[in-house]
Design a protein with these regions (language model features):
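Extracytoplasmic substrate-binding proteins
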Residues: 126-198, 290, 299-325
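Short helix-initiation/N-cap motifs at beta->coil->alpha
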Residues: 43-45, 98-105, 227-235
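A short, structured surface patch at a secondary-structure boundary
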Residues: 56, 62-111
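Structured C-terminal subdomain patch of bacterial secreted/periplasmic proteins
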Residues: 252-325
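N-terminal signal peptide c-region/cleavage motif recognized by signal peptidases
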Residues: 20-28
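Basic- and aromatic-lined ligand-binding clefts that recognize polyanionic substrates
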Residues: 56-60, 64-68, 166-221, 230
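N-terminal export leaders
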Residues: 6-12
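Proline-aspartate-enriched helix->loop->beta-strand connector
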Residues: 113-119, 135, 240, 244-249
């Protein structure tokens, strides 16, 4: 596929995409003098061949943007999102908004004329459409192999810009911090992780959507894995009280997304308010100040899949375990 296509072909491609018309943009052209060198890299779809040092990169995933930011790589377009503090600079007008984390803005892409598009997670469903517009990488991760997939993503993006040494250094730091947390976690009592969406609560045991707390970071689980409920196990406050966790970890979805009202237009209840009740206070976690409200954006929006998000999340849990001994 051409690394750059004419405005006319871009318009045709975007029109086809917008109306669901199938068909490739065009056949790959032979290499031309002055064409950027290419490299074969790994991504979630397998192997991909892309140009070295792309400059007009559009990123539709916050964990991938985390990698780009950590390695100081060029970004031209981003998804509109609730950014964590360390990524808030991407809300600046110099970065064009190219859609949401789910839906691309094809008119914006036509203006940007990207030479690389990056999708993952929420945006991965648009891979086939976007790949007709520009070379596209899918940097989705599997929670059960999070560090391995994070390593692949860092290696892939670093290799495009000759920053392999920085990528290796970054991942060595991530792996070292994770191992340090696992050593602390081995000495700690089991914990219960829950996701709160307003007043709805679901436990996240090993293998669940956010089970990486146990699967990757080594926190001993209070609940066993339940393969039949990959999105989590529904719970009420009385269920948590009955389990009596020594540690209770909470992810607040609404705090991550900035949601202010529910579907009925009623104000949402912040998790810190929701969990401030006699049932939770009566648990071992409540009595011993071991209710930990995890960084909502780092966990819910980035899934700990970006190296900086992972380092922040590990540091928070380490501090909690050390303080709660």
């Amino acid at each position: 596929m051409k690394l750059m296509i004419s405005r006319r072909r871009m318009a045709l491609a975007l029109t086809a995409a917008a109306w669901g018309i199938s068909g490739a943009v065009g056949a790959a052209a032979p290499a031309q003098p002055g064409q950027p060198a290419q490299i074969s890299v790994q991504h979630a779809k397998g192997q991909a061949t892309v140009a070295l040092k792309p400059q007009r990169v559009v990123v539709y995933d916050l964990a991938a943007l985390d990698v780009m930011h950590a390695l100081q790589l060029p970004v031209a377009g981003v998804a509109k999102a609730e950014y964590p503090d360390y990524l808030k600079s991407y809300a600046d007008a110099k970065y064009q908004v190219a859609g949401s984390l789910f839906i691309p803005d094809y008119e914006a892409l036509s203006r940007i004329r990207p030479d690389l598009i990056v999708v993952a997670g929420r945006s991965a469903a648009k891979y086939d459409v976007l790949a007709k517009i520009a070379p596209t990488l899918d940097l989705s991760v599997d929670g059960k192999n999070l560090l391995g997939d994070m390593q692949r993503n860092v290696d892939t993006l670093a290799s495009l810009y000759g920053k392999q040494a920085q990528g290796r250094q970054l991942m060595a730091k991530v792996r070292g911090e994770v191992e340090g947390l696992k050593a602390l976690a081995a000495q700690a009592e089991p914990g219960l992780l829950v996701l709160a969406v307003n007043t709805s609560i679901s436990a996240q045991p090993p293998g669940a959507r956010f089970g990486l707390l146990h699967d990757v970071l080594g926190i001993k689980p209070l609940l066993a894995a339940d393969a039949s409920k990959p999105r989590g196990v529904p719970m009420k406050m009385e269920d948590i009280a009955r389990l009596d966790p020594a540690w209770l970890y909470v992810i607040d979805r609404n705090a991550a997304t900035g949601t202010q009202t529910d579907k009925q237009g009623q104000p949402v209840i912040a998790s810190k308010q929701l969990f401030d009740n006699a049932q939770i206070q009566g648990t071992r976690a409540g009595r011993n100040a071991r209710v930990v409200f995890l960084d909502p954006k780092g966990w819910y929006l980035l899934g700990s899949a970006g190296p900086t998000a992972m380092l922040h999340n590990v540091a928070q849990i380490k501090a909690a375990l050390q303080a709660g001994k």
